Each structure stands twice: as structure tokens, then as C-alpha cells.
Amino acid sequence: FLSENKVVKGTSDAKRIETIGMKIKTASERFLTANGKSDYLNDYKWEYNLVDSKEINAWCMPGGKIVFYTGILPVCKDDAGIAAVMGHEVAHALANHGQQRMSAGLIQQVGAVGAALAAEKYAPKYQNEAMQAYGAASTVGGMLPFSRAHESEADMIGLTLMAIAGYDPINAVKVWERMSAQSEGK
């Protein structure tokens, strides 16, 4: 991804991402240690990247590679806003959400194969309908609640990381409100 996109380096915004990232990293180390998980510290090789894109997004890969798009910076508005988004994304990594999502997706795919084989054998005439029903049910019943639970957990851990790093968590609410307004086109 990074080799295919323009990574911003040396600018004041790139330096802010790095500086705030280091504060959140230190906060995450304190958080893991306080929760008896200091053995996980070596699992993360934190890296902070700013990519030149108008897209309003940020994400963290398992292992700690964080990507912020320049388009999210106006929504973040200030360092506390960046810390809110950074804390949330780091929380996904700490809670191992990426790996869990991949595992859940694999389970969903295996289930789809089983459903396809069963439909082919027992109801070949309705195989397409059976697969559509399976897809909808597994998404609504399995993947969406899973995603909502992950987002809630990342919100809680992210607020904690933000506070440990010295930022007022109330700023997170303001960022999420601005983010919501952006997505609604306001």
C-alpha cells in the first residue's frame, strides 16, 4: 500500500502524526503493562505514516503500522483530535481486531462452502436463494455485531490511551461528531 501511494514526509503534519503517535505508543505500553500484558509489547513495531489522499480515513494494520490520510486532518482539527483517531486505531491493533476479523471471515467462507454443498445436494433448484440467505444471515447475525463490538471496544481503549497520553478524552466526542457530520454531507 505505502509503495503505491504518496507518503508525506518531513512536513509539519507528518511530524505531528509521528509525535502524537509516539505519545500514544507510550500510553499503549503503560496500558498493556498495567493490564498484565507487557509480554505483548514486542508484538508491535509502531510506524506512523501520512498518505496524501483526500479520503477521510485512518487505519492500523496488525502489528502497529498506522496510516493517516491527509483528508482526515481537517476533521481532526488539532492534536487532541489526531490523538482521538490515533488512540482508536491503535486500540484495534492492541485488541487484535484485524486478526479476529480475518478469522471470522474465514469461518464465514467455510460456512458458505458448506451451505453451497448442502444446497446443491438437497435443494439444487433453490441454491442461489439459499446462498443469498446464508450471506445475509452470516453478515447480519455474525459479522456486523462483531464489527460493532470491535468499534465499541476500540472506542473505550482509545479514550483510555488518549487520557494516558495527556489528551482530554472529551475531544474524541467532538471528532466523532465532526466525522459523523462529514459522512452525512453536512
How does the language model describe each region?
Residues D168-K186:
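Long, well-structured alpha-helical subdomains associated
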Residues F1-V110, A118-Y122, I164-A165, Q182-G185:
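Peri-catalytic and regulatory segments of divalent metal-dependent proteins
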Residues K54, E129-Q132, R178:
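Short hydrophobic/aromatic-rich motifs at helix boundaries and adjacent loops
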Residues K23, A93, M156-T160, K174:
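Charged/polar positions on well-ordered alpha helices
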Residues Y122-N171:
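Metalloprotease/metallohydrolase-associated module, dominated by Zn2+-dependent proteases
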